[in-house]
């Protein structure tokens, strides 16, 4: 593998988290990863930074600080209103190359996976995808990513020795969401955005809501398999009592 864009001797001792937002709301998985990032940063006595691209998103920066971030780098631009891989990929790449964090984490959403793969190639670094746990090797100051395979029968522990940033995407729902601390203070940094309309090759013509529940946002999920023989009414009643929703295997 060729050398990455920056090496371990050039890195800043910080954990960075990509904060994905949709129509003015931070994705739950971004807040979950931010909570875990706080834990990792505290172990190493490093700084936790959130990276927030969008349009009119400064209020979300304050929310992220209450969830544990020390700094939020805001990239506010009309061309970032809706996620596009060209726009978000460009501004996030520029910001990471400016800050050179040791660790960069993203939620494993559709957009997060798209962005992470593209950035890993541009950084010439590795990417540990769909991680189920993260912890620090304190002795060597390395991120240890746990990735399951073969239906969960094998768990690999992966470290990135020399390439930076150490990148990982995290599955939704694997980390607990920390309680917001309204008294917490942090720094909001406005990062200049140099984007031109001709850079954006993707246009959103129409958005159609499917009406299907986003299971990653459901607090309780009651799941039935073939054994219920298609009779989900009891499960629906139980899910209603528990304040959740119904799924199937």
Task: Please give the residue ranges for each predicted region.
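N-terminal glycine-rich FAD/FM-binding segment characteristic of electron-transfer flavoproteins
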Residues: 1-249
């Amino acid at each position: 593998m060729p050398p990455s864009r920056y090496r371990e001797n050039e890195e800043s001792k910080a954990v960075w988290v990509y904060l994905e937002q949709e129509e003015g709301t931070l994705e739950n998985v971004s807040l979950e990863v931010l909570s875990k990032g706080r834990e990792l940063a505290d172990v190493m006595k490093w700084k936790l930074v959130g990276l927030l691209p969008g349009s009119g998103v400064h209020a979300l920066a304050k929310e992220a600080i209450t969830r544990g971030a020390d700094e939020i780098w805001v990239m506010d631009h009309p061309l970032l209103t809706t996620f596009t891989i060209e726009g978000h990929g460009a501004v996030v790449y520029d910001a990471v190359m400016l800050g050179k964090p040791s660790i960069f984490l993203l939620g494993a959403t559709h957009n997060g996976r798209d962005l992470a793969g593209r950035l890993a190639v541009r950084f010439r670094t590795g990417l540990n995808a769909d991680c189920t746990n993260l912890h620090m090797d304190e002795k060597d100051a390395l991120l240890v990513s746990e990735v399951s395979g073969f239906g969960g029968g094998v768990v690999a522990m992966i470290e990135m020795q020399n390439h930076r940033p150490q990148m990982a995407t995290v599955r939704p729902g694997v980390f607990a969401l920390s309680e917001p601390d309204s008294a917490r203070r942090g720094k909001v940094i406005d990062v200049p955005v140099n984007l031109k309309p001709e850079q954006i090759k993707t246009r959103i013509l129409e958005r159609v809501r499917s009406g299907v529940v986003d299971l990653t946002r459901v607090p309780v999920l009651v799941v039935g398999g073939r054994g219920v023989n298609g009779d989900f009414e009891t499960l629906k009643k139980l899910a209603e009592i528990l304040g959740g929703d119904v799924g199937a295997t």
